[in-house]
Every structure is written in structure tokens, then in C-alpha cells.
Swiss-Prot record:
The chain crosses the membrane at residues 682-702, 706-726. GTP binds at residues 44-51. Residues 34-263 form the GB1/RHD3-type G domain. Its EC number is 3.6.5.-. This is Protein SEY1. CDD domains: GBP (cd01851). It comes from Saccharomyces cerevisiae (strain YJM789). Interacts with RTN1 and YOP1; GTP binding is not required for these interactions. Belongs to the TRAFAC class dynamin-like GTPase superfamily. GB1/RHD3 GTPase family. RHD3 subfamily. SUPFAM superfamilies: P-loop containing nucleoside triphosphate hydrolases.
Length: 776
């Protein structure tokens, strides 16, 4: 190829072109391409029209074969061309990306004969460096193994995995299968399904390296299929099909756009040249690419085929034979051994005629697949056994005689029983060769049993703590509220004594020594101490919440008022007082007030009778770890202390005293008013005097019919309004009537003033007109 628009990137002697970077610089000039470029390769049989397709699609000038002269190899090595023009059905005016096209030497050519080393390395190189690999094939080649390059693709896939399979990225390559001379008799979907099935089958049969055993074909490749009409017999349709194909290379944002981000190598253009050269060097120098002879290839193919047939027969019998036996160890192991031996025997009978090293290699691989398949059943059996044994253990623990057997003893006995039965079953599988290694299973079993026992212990502990909490919290609340609602000077001594006794009563069953407890679930001394500490924390938090929620300002005022009224309103024997003089009221007031305020300071600050502040012996919250957090500010800007003993601030204390004084002052005033009312009531003789002196007027009224009628009407009206509470509507009606009357009067006055003003203006205008006439 002598065209100046392309260079031979890799020549026939497998040498990489050392001036590739200069070629790229010539193609792009001074433009900063960055990542806005794409690489496409074409791969296929010799003389299948690869170069022709590239020239029509990308407007390149690769050399093509003249079929009228001779069918021979045209492209030698790997050629590279640059283009920005793609043949499409639509005009794209915006700036198109730079595309670099690799034309790979055709496979299965007579020039190289049986030397297939270069074509396989070239195909591997194309996959390694390209975003899109166009696989050019004829429709009649689909279904063939050698003719459609499936054998070559299998080798390339395998080596590609070994070289690039462990890369920790999501890079993929698009395999674009272009089916030539597609006449449409067989739908494209059917052809694509056939090729896809062949590729998936090839992938499952690959010898995958460590770390890639579970990989899928679609982890590394995406598949697309396009059909093209016959170039000579259907030239117009061929051109139209190529243009439609070109649309997928330029129409960004569409579903069929081929240059997806995950295909790009994310390297600048000069970095790509270095990457491509390093890839070729790795492919060329890797010893694993020294391909075996055709005889070894045949042996590998046939032994793989025999192995797959034996494995398929094994799998077809497996589920039906094993399903009824999964719960019986003896029957299950016998059937597994039988099925495995039948599969290996069938393989040995047919595959032992081929090369021994290949035969043994595939036999080992088959044995591994069988063990892998069987291991699922073994794991399922062991898991089922584990669940059954665990259910038995839980039943034994829950139904034990708690008077003679402790929780710890029951769990320990059950654990020993589980381990013994599980290990015996696992050894049975191992002796029969069904289980190669039991270390992983044993480790998993040990971790599982320890985790389950821990969960069982946690559940038992949670139940015990729940029972303690269920009794402890309500008892504390009830006792504390009762003591605070009827406080004495030693109320905090009483509360703390009750607090300690309530805790002790609820956990006395677990006490072994003074301040030492054992909750009987197999915990260490430090763990038991931690649980005891948590119970005390719960108790202190309950006490703290109860005290501070109950002793609010209104509650304390109510307590003080009740203490005041107990002394002020009732005597020593509990009888209500009857006041006679104000001096008696004032004396009782002073005594009652002093009695009430005796507990005010007690309710403001939690201190014992020895005047020692009550401080919790355990941290009630994380905030208590630092002294800076003891004081906080509320939404109203008032500072408070988080310390348990500090109940009221100074400002709150003043508020309590103010409310208390107002309430007791009202009580005293009411008492004094009762004395005044008693003294100032109207004597009965006044009513007799009024009747005697007003008798004549009363008789005059009742003798006059008009007065009697008006009196009855007004009395009945007053009774109805008062009886049904209609004073509000009556007042509204009166107010409305008065308002309407006032408005009407204002309108009349306004109208009168306006009319008077208009009359005056008319007289003035007449006088003004007369004066003008006189002047004229």
C-alpha cells in the first residue's frame, strides 16, 4: 500500500512503526484533539471486502483487490488511516471527531498458510486498542467454525482475558458484526442469534485465569449486527445500507450511537500511540501466544466437546436423581458417587484416544466442574442440617428445666452436639471424594455457630433487661411522683433510699456478692458489670426525667399552694376555719406561708438532709464527659444546668414565688371579703318599711290598665330575653338601629347643606351676569 493517507502501523515482520506519533501529528495539525477521537478496526477473512467496506464507509483509500485479475492478499500487516468524513444518509454540519481506522490483514489466507500466529496476534491487538471492532463476514459463513473465524475468536478471547482480564475498570469493546451479501431470506435477527449463541458458547468453554472465573462475555464486549446488500448485484441498496451504518458513527445521543464512553480508552492521542505500542510488544513477546499445533488444537476441541457432552448428561440426570434424597445422608452420598463415576467413565471411554496431556488436562477440568456442581448440593445439605440442629438446640434451651439446668449449660451442651453431627456428615463427603477441601466450610460453620449463639445470648439478655425495665421504670416513676407531690424537708433522702431499694429488688436474683452480679448467660465479670452499670444508667435517666418533668414551675406553685391551704383553710384537726376578725386571718396567713415555703428550696435543688448535692454515680449521657457541656441556653436565652440536682434557675425561682404570692393573696382577700359581706348585709326590717311606705304607689300602678299592660309586656319580654340568653342579639339590633338612624340624620344634614350652598352660588352667578351687562 503506497497511498500517502495511510501508514503501515505493523508490517509483515511484526515490527511496530516508530513514526506513528509523527503521523498522528500530521493528521491533526495544531488542533488540541484531547479525547475527542475514536479508533476502529476491521477483522475478517482474506478477500472478504474489508478494505472496500472501510473505503466506502469512511472515505479512506486502502488498497483493494481486483477480483477480475486475481484473488490474493492485498492488505499485509496492519494499516492505519485517518478520516473525519463518514458516509451517512444525513448531512452533519457540526465539527466531526477524528477517526483512526485500522485495516487488519485478513485471516485464513493462502500466503501465510498454516502460520496463523500473526493473524491471531493482529486480531488480539485490534481488540486491545480499538473501541469498535468490525467483524466482516459473509452470510453463508454463519454457522461455520473456521470460515467465520470462531476458532480464532476463541483463542483471542482466551488470551485477551489472560492479558487484560484483571483490569479494574469498566472498559468494553464493541464487536460490530457486518454481514455481507445479506439477501434477506434469513432475518438479520436470526443470524445475530446464531452468532451470539456461538460466542456465548465459546466464552463458557474458555480456560479463564484466576480472578476471572465468573466473568461474562458481556463484561468485556458489546455485540451489534448489521446486514449489507450485495455490492455488485444490489449496488444502490449496498450504498444505502453503508450510509445507514455510517449514521450510527455520527449521530450522538441516539440509542444506536456506536462511540459510547465505556468503549474509549480515556487516553490523549499521544498516550494512545504509546499504549498501542506497549500492547503490541506485550502480545508479541508473551510466550502464551506461541500457539499449539493443529493436532493439539483438534485434541483440545474434541476433548472439550466430549467433556461438555458428559457434563450435560450428568446435569440432565442430576436434579431428578438427587432431589428426593437431599434429606438422607447415606442415600445422597451413594447417588452422588454413582453419577460422578458415570460421567468420568463416559469421558474416559472417548477422550483417552487423544493426546494424553490434553486428555488429562480436560479430565481435571471436568472433575472440577463436577465437584463445583456437587458442592452446591453438599452446601445445601449442610445448611439444611445446620438449620435442623439449630432448631433442636433452641428447642432444648427454651424447654429446659430452669430449676436444674442453667441457660449457659444448655447452650454449651447443644453446641457440642451440633459440632459433632456436622463434622461427621462433612467427613463422610470428604472420604468419598465429593468434597476436596473442608477448611472453608469448617471455618464458615464455626463463624456461623458462634454468631448464632451470640444472637441467642443477646436475645436472652434483652429479654431479661426488658423484664427488669418493665418493672423498674414504672415503680420508680410512681414512687418519686408520690414523694414529690407531698414533699417533706427530707424528701430527697426518701427518694434516694427508695431509688436504691427499687433497683436492688428488681435485680436481686442476679446478685452474687455485694456490688457484683451475674446475669447467667455466660458473660465475663466485666461484661456483667457493664450490664449492671447500664441498668443503673437506665434507672438514673428515669429518675432524672421524672423529677425534671414533674417539677415544672406550675407544679411547684401548685404544691406550695396546697401546703399553704392545708394550714390556712383547715385547723389542726382538719376542720374548715370560720373567720371572725382580720387579725385572725393575718395570723393564719403568716403561719401557712412559712409552712409552704419550708419545701421551696428543697424542690429547687436536690440535696440530702446533710446538705450534700445528689450526683449520679454513672454518666447519664455522652454530654457529661466534658464540663463545658454542663451549662446550656434555652430558646428564651435562659441558662440552665444539666446537672441532676439543679432543678430551678434563680429566674425560675423568682417566677414561682411571684405566682405563689399572687395566688395566696387572692385567697386571703377572699377570706376578708367574706367577713365584710357578713357585716354589711341589708336588715330584714328594711323590706317591711319599703312595703309600708310604697303601698300607695303600688296600688296606683295596679289600678291603671295601661301601666299594668306595659308592666306585663315589659316583664314578659325581659323574662324571654333573659331565659334564652338573647341579650347579645338584642344589643346588636339596638346598636344597628342607632347606627342606621345616625347615618340617615347625617345624610339629611349633608343634603341640606349642599342644597343651600348651590342656591347661594346661583344667586351670585345672576348678580355677576347683571354687573357685566351694565358695564357693557
Amino acid at each position: 500500500m503506497a497511498d500517502r493517507s495511510a501508514i503501515q502501523l505493523i508490517d509483515e515482520e511484526k515490527e511496530f512503526h516508530q513514526s506513528a506519533l509523527q503521523y498522528f501529528q500530521q493528521c491533526i495539525g495544531n488542533r488540541d484533539v484531547g479525547l475527542d477521537y475514536h479508533v476502529i478496526s476491521v477483522f475478517g477473512s482474506q478477500s472478504s471486502g474489508k478494505s472496500t467496506l472501510l473505503n466506502v464507509l469512511f472515505n479512506t483509500n486502502f488498497d483493494t483487490m481486483d477480483a477480475q485479475v486475481k484473488r490474493q492478499q492485498t492488505t499485509k500487516g496492519i494499516w492505519l488511516a485517518h478520516t473525519k468524513q463518514v458516509n451517512t444518509t444525513i448531512e452533519i454540519d457540526n465539527d466531526r471527531p477524528d477517526i483512526f481506522v485500522l485495516d487488519v490483514e485478513g485471516s485464513d489466507g493462502s500466503e501465510r498458510g498454516e502460520d496463523q500466529d500473526f493473524e491471531r496476534k493482529a486480531a488480539l491487538f485490534a481488540i486491545a486498542v480499538s473501541e469498535v471492532l468490525i467483524v466482516n463476514m459473509w452470510e453463508q459463513q454463519i454457522g461455520l467454525y473456521q470460515g467465520n473465524n470462531m476458532a480464532l475468536l476463541k483463542t483471542v478471547f482466551e488470551v485477551n482475558l489472560s492479558l487484560f482480564g484483571k483490569n479494574d475498570n469498566d472498559h468494553k469493546v464493541l464487536l460490530l458484526f457486518v454481514i455481507r451479501d445479506h439477501v434477506g431470506v434469513t432475518p438479520l435477527s436470526s443470524l445475530s442469534d446464531s452468532v451470539t449463541r456461538e460466542l456465548e458458547k465459546i466464552w463458557t468453554e474458555l480456560s479463564k485465569p484466576a480472578g476471572c472465573e465468573g466473568s461474562s462475555l458481556y463484561d468485556y464486549f458489546d455485540l451489534k449486527f448489521v446486514g449489507l446488500a450485495h455490492k455488485l448485484l444490489q449496488e444502490d441498496k449496498f450504498t444505502q445500507d453503508v450510509k445507514k451504518l455510517g449514521d450510527s458513527f455520527v449521530m450522538k445521543g441516539t440509542e444506536n450511537y456506536y462511540f459510547k464512553p465505556q468503549y474509549h480508552h480515556r487516553l490523549p492521542l499521544d498516550g494512545w500511540t504509546m499504549y498501542a505500542e506497549n500492547c503490541w510488544d506485550q502480545i508479541e513477546r508473551n510466550k502464551d501466544l506461541d500457539l499449539p499445533t493443529q493436532q493439539i488444537l483438534v485434541a483440545r476441541f474434541k476433548t472439550e466437546e466430549i467433556s461438555n457432552e458428559a457434563l450435560e448428561e450428568f446435569i440432565s440426570k442430576y436434579d431428578e436423581s438427587i432431589a428426593p434424597l437431599k434429606g438422607n445422608l447415606g442415600s445422597l452420598t451413594s447417588q452422588l458417587v454413582k453419577l460422578k463415576e458415570e460421567c468420568l467413565t463416559k469421558y474416559d471411554e472417548q477422550a483417552s484416544r487423544y493426546a494424553r496431556n490434553v486428555y488429562m488436562e480436560k479430565r481435571e477440568a471436568l472433575n472440577t466442574k463436577l465437584n463445583s456442581h456437587i458442592s452446591g448440593t453438599i452446601n445445601e445439605f449442610l445448611e439444611s442440617l445446620m438449620e435442623k440442629l439449630w432448631d433442636d438446640l433452641k428447642l432444648e434451651v427454651s424447654s429446659r428445666d430452669k430449676a436444674t439446668t442453667s441457660f449457659v449449660e444448655s447452650v454449651a451442651a447443644g453446641k457440642s452436639k451440633i459440632e459433632k453431627e456436622f463434622n461427621e456428615s462433612m467427613e463422610t463427603f470428604k472420604k468419598l471424594g465429593l468434597l476436596i477441601s473442608n477448611e472453608e466450610i469448617t471455618c464458615k460453620f464455626s463463624d456461623d455457630i458462634e454468631e448464632r449463639i451470640k444472637q441467642l445470648c443477646d436475645a436472652e439478655l434483652k429479654a431479661k433487661i426488658g423484664r427488669i425495665k418493665k418493672n423498674l421504670v414504672p415503680e420508680l416513676k410512681d414512687h418519686v411522683i408520690h414523694l414529690l407531690s407531698h414533699p417533706s424537708k427530707k424528701v430527697w433522702d426518701d427518694i434516694m433510699n427508695d431509688f436504691e431499694s427499687t433497683i436492688k429488688d428488681n435485680i436481686s436474683a442476679y446478685q452474687v456478692e455485694k456490688d457484683k452480679y451475674d446475669f447467667k448467660i455466660g458473660l465475663s465479670e466485666s461484661e456483667n458489670a457493664k450490664i449492671y452499670k447500664n441498668i443503673r444508667i437506665l434507672a438514673w435517666r428515669t429518675l432524672d426525667t421524672t423529677v425534671h418533668d414533674y417539677l415544672k414551675i406550675d407544679t411547684i406553685v401548685s404544691i406550695l399552694r396546697d401546703r399553704f391551704e392545708d394550714v390556712f383553710r383547715y385547723d389542726a384537726e382538719g376542720s374548715p376555719r370560720l373567720w371572725k376578725t382580720e387579725e385572725e386571718i393575718d395570723g393564719a396567713f403568716r403561719v401557712a406561708k412559712e409552712h409552704a415555703l419550708e419545701v421551696f428550696e428543697v424542690l429547687s435543688l436536690a440535696v440530702t438532709s446533710d446538705n450534700v448535692e445528689i450526683i449520679p454515680d454513672v454518666p447519664m449521657a455522652e454530654e457529661e464527659s466534658g464540663e463545658d457541656n454542663e451549662i446550656y441556653r434555652d430558646n428564651e436565652g435562659v441558662f440552665h444546668s444539666r446537672r441532676f440536682a439543679h432543678i430551678l434557675t434563680e429566674l425560675q425561682k423568682e417566677n414561682v414565688l411571684d405566682q405563689f404570692r399572687r395566688q395566696i393573696n387572692i385567697t386571703v382577700l377572699d377570706s376578708k371579703r367574706s367577713i365584710i359581706t357578713t357585716r354589711t348585709h341589708i336588715p330584714p326590717w328594711i323590706y317591711v318599711l319599703l312595703a309600708v311606705l310604697g303601698w300607695n304607689e303600688f296600688v296606683a300602678v295596679i289600678r291603671n290598665p295601661l301601666f299594668v299592660t306595659l308592666t306585663l309586656i315589659l316583664g314578659a319580654t325581659f323574662f324571654v330575653i333573659h331565659k334564652f340568653g338573647l341579650w347579645g342579639p338584642v344589643v346588636n339590633v339596638v346598636q344597628s338601629a342607632v347606627g342606621e338612624t345616625r347615618t340617615a340624620i347625617k345624610d339629611k344634614l349633608r343634603q341640606f347643606v349642599v342644597e343651600d350652598h348651590e342656591v347661594k352660588e346661583s344667586f351670585e352667578m345672576k348678580d355677576f351676569s347683571k354687573n357685566e351687562q351694565k358695564e357693557k
